[in-house]
UniProtKB/Swiss-Prot annotation:
Alphabetized GO MF terms: ATP binding; ATP phosphoribosyltransferase activity
Record-level GO cellular component terms: cytoplasm
InterPro entries registered for this protein in UniProt: ATP_PRibTrfase_cat, ATP_PRibTrfase_CS, ATP_PRibTrfase_HisG, ATP_PRibTrfase_HisG_short
Binding partners and assembly: Heteromultimer composed of HisG and HisZ subunits.
Enzyme nomenclature, EC number: 2.4.2.17
Free-text comment about domains: Lacks the C-terminal regulatory region which is replaced by HisZ.
Subcellular localization(s) per the UniProt record: Cytoplasm
Record keywords, A-Z: Amino-acid biosynthesis, ATP-binding, Cytoplasm, Glycosyltransferase, Histidine biosynthesis, Nucleotide-binding, Transferase
PROSITE patterns cross-referenced by the UniProt entry: ATP_P_PHORIBOSYLTR (PS01316)
Catalyzed reactions: 1-(5-phospho-beta-D-ribosyl)-ATP + diphosphate = 5-phospho-alpha-D-ribose 1-diphosphate + ATP
UniProt-recorded name of the protein: ATP phosphoribosyltransferase
């Protein structure tokens, strides 16, 4: 049976709505009383696993799910061995460098060598500043990255931005966009090549409604 890894949180409703358009109903995940992490479509055609956003590519890479919905930001950070098949067009955001509004640095290239940058996206931040040939120390954080500059722990942050409201409320401003991100359909490469569980048919159905 085809298994699809879908992300918890804000991306879940749109992921479920998209799957409903191709005949797969996992809306039970939207029931607040639901505690199941894996459910089967009422037709018995496929099952879905509800996992954390950053874990979607892990389950796909290791073959526990044949398909998954993963943010491009997660794929850039984790660099998993998966096939990136389709841009699903929702969950739009961008990964940006931000500094305090009062900062004298209005461009990442102006940051002093060996300064500190706080981020959840450690690999993306390191890759970006390496390309600039600017040595920096990346401080890994898992939440409230904005506190880095506020507390003086870092001169800048690299973080996801959607509306920019959180930055503004914390007196931070974007100075550079690293890349834009949307949710992608990913697949386990070997399963996809072998067309396990008619994966190609489902991918084509999704492609047709985009």
């Amino acid at each position: 049976m085809l298994t699809i890894a879908i992300p918890k949180g804000g991306l879940l409703p749109e992921a479920i709505a998209l799957l409903q358009q191709v005949g797969l109903d996992f809306s039970a995940f939207l029931d607040k009383k639901n505690r199941q992490l894996q459910i089967t479509d009422p037709t018995g055609t496929a099952r879905a696993m509800l996992v954390r956003t950053h874990d979607v590519p892990v389950y796909v890479e290791y073959g526990q799910a044949q398909l998954g919905f993963a943010g491009y930001d997660v794929l850039r950070e984790k660099k998993p061995d998966v096939a990136n098949l389709l841009d699903l067009g929702f969950g739009g955001c961008r990964l940006s460098v931000a500094v305090p509004k009062a900062s004298p640095y209005k461009n990442p290239r102006q940051l002093p060598p060996n300064c500190r940058v706080a981020s959840k996206f450690v690999n993306c931040a390191k890759d970006y500043f390496r390309d600039l040939d600017l040595p920096i120390e990346v401080i890994p954080l898992h939440g409230s990255v904005e506190l880095g500059p506020i507390t003086g722990m870092s001169e800048a942050i690299v973080d996801l931005v959607s509306t920019g409201n959180t930055l503004r409320e914390n007196n931070l401003e974007e100075v550079e966009v690293l890349f834009h991100s949307t949710v992608r359909l990913i697949a386990h490469p070997t399963s996809y090549r072998a067309n396990r569980h008619n994966m190609l048919d489902w991918v084509q159905k999704l492609e047709q409604i985009l």
